[in-house]
Design a protein with these regions (language model features):
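Processing junctions and N-termini across compartments
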Residues: 28, 172-175, 215-219
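USP/UBP deubiquitinase core
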Residues: 2-143, 242-247
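Exposed substrate/partner-binding surface patches
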Residues: 1-22, 43, 56-70, 86, ...
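Beta-sheet entry/capping signal
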Residues: 33, 175-177, 242, 304
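Predominantly the structural core of cysteine protease catalytic domains
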Residues: 89-157, 169-171, 180-182, 214, ...
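Internal, well-ordered alpha-helical segments in soluble enzyme and binding-protein domains
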Residues: 118, 160, 174-177, 221
Length: 314
């Protein structure tokens, strides 16, 4: 997980010294819960989110506080309790209540689970229970196509926006262009992560180039001229403060791809992946601050987390 370098100076409610000295607690495994523990540690070191939850920031955004009419609202409440324990003292905690609530909805079983899937579950759960409606005002400087695309994304998020979407939601603009008549269609997608196949390179920047490169679709028919053959290209439309990069470490048969992927903070500028219709105002470099690691295979393995605190110590 990486954070945008423009936000190195955190605007936190709690004193910076609080985050420099605390949050070094461990989490005891309670059965096959290492995937849960690693995600908790990763999210705990996402300080914009942690500060928001520790200081009850959700009460300021929405007077309803946590929406208890939503599904699994008790998971969110229990996670906040775990978070407070993690940042109370630097020791080992046992998140028994949180794990039991996850067991009740089959998110924790007697078998090994996938950390990436659990991360998405947690982000969706937190977003659902911390969400509030939003409005939008268009700038006079936007072009018609920019207004149209912005409106599409607004309609996708206007009823359930939260600090989760503010900090993690990636917006993609997918361009489909006919090779014959150059007619263009657009699709709009959003995600909490960029999921990369790691087959073609061991360098993260090359894997990203592969993900965002043009793709020829032979059997796609143009809506305008009926010609078969289009070019598909994925663009970024908006990037959040934090980017989650998911490396697909298992193939379609469940076999683990034992391959190291190398990352360079100073090398990747995500600006080059933005849509030409989007006028990005600055470069997009991100600092790596947290990694979920896996040892073993799909059936018998162990997850653990490596994170940096505000002192850049692991």
């Amino acid at each position: 997980m990486s954070k945008f370098d423009k936000h190195k100076e955190y605007k936190l409610t709690l004193p910076r010294k609080y985050y420099e000295k605390k949050g070094l607690s461990g989490i005891q495994n309670l059965g096959n819960t290492c995937y849960v523990n690693s995600i908790i540690q990763c999210l705990s070191n996402t300080l914009k989110l942690t500060d928001y939850l520790l200081t009850n920031g959700y009460k300021k955004d929405d007077p309803r506080e946590i929406n208890k009419t939503k599904n699994n609202f008790n998971i969110t409440l229990s996670y906040i309790f775990v978070l407070k324990k993690l940042w109370e003292h630097n020791n080992v905690i046992q998140p028994l209540s949180f794990i039991n609530k996850l067991k009740n909805i089959k998110q924790v079983t007697n078998e090994q689970q996938d950390a990436h899937e659990f991360l998405l579950f947690m982000l969706n759960n937190l977003n659902e229970n911390l969400s509030y409606p939003i409005n939008i005002n268009f700038s006079d400087k936007l072009t018609n196509i920019q207004k149209d695309i912005t409106l599409k994304f607004y309609n996708m998020n206007k009823k359930d926006y939260s600090i989760i979407k503010e900090n993690f939601n990636i917006m993609f603009l997918i361009n489909i262009k006919c090779k014959q008549c150059n007619n263009e269609d657009f699709m709009y997608e959003q995600s909490y992560d960029i999921s990369l196949s790691i087959n073609k390179s061991h360098l993260l920047d090359e894997l990203l180039d592969e993900y965002f490169k043009e793709e020829y679709i032979e059997d796609k028919k143009c809506d305008k001229c009926n010609f078969k053959g289009c070019i598909k290209k994925i663009y970024l439309w908006n990037l959040p403060k934090y980017i989650i990069i998911h490396l697909q470490k298992f193939d379609n048969n469940g076999r683990k791809i034992n391959k190291h992927i190398y990352y360079s903070n100073s090398k990747i500028n995500y600006l080059k992946y933005f849509s030409p219709n989007r006028e990005a105002r600055h470069n997009y470099f991100y600092d790596l601050y947290s990694v979920i690691c896996h040892q073993g295979n799909a059936n018998n393995g162990h997850y653990y987390n490596i994170s940096k605190n505000l002192n850049n110590k692991i």
